[in-house]
């Protein structure tokens, strides 16, 4: 029997998820169909219910529905509860189970695919939105010496840090980053989506081994261009994170984790 899954978001025409999951299914021998649903902001719960009624067994969830997906769940993982957002749902009988694989997907891309272990490093996370919330637990568990958040809205970042309450997690204003250096700098702001640069001092890159842009398919964004100008040897966008979180969802649904490297290689565009 063919199993049915989909991604739901708005807009959804840009999504790579059907391609990714079809490649996963082909390489693992799983019999499934995977589609895309343009969700309704006014009736997300109805969209989910209709998909379930048609035999759907799980959903990947993208913007702007991750909070609604979390609220819809009857049971949520610790990662989803911390992020207050779900990027994957699984349906078991009457239960709606919620997970958030964004952070673990990002961590796996950085450590495994890009060869940059977080243990013993100073990490700078730009932003304090859902992507950062989802990354904090996996990142802190990886053993950095310090994890610093910087955000335009300093209060939002401070409240998040207080909520986490971890001794290795701290908050800076962008201005307070002047004179500081980091081993890894990650841009999780929305600035690159509109071709802008977060107001980060150029000096944060001078000792960095990797600059990572969560947006993908945007080429050499202003953030990555500044990092390259400051001598950062390794630049990456978020396509690896996209594929790795998809693999985590696939494994949660199907019980088998697909190989990700061939899919990442197929989807990666040059950073030019």
Report residues per predicted region:
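Glycine-rich adenosine-cofactor-binding loop
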Residues: 9, 100-103, 110, 114, ...
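Helix N-cap at the beta1-alpha1 junction of Rossmann-like dinucleotide-binding domains, i.e.
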Residues: 12-13, 154-155, 218
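Mobile, glycine- and charge-enriched loop segments
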Residues: 22, 26-27, 31-37, 107-125, ...
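Adenosine-phosphate binding glycine-rich loop
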Residues: 120, 214-272
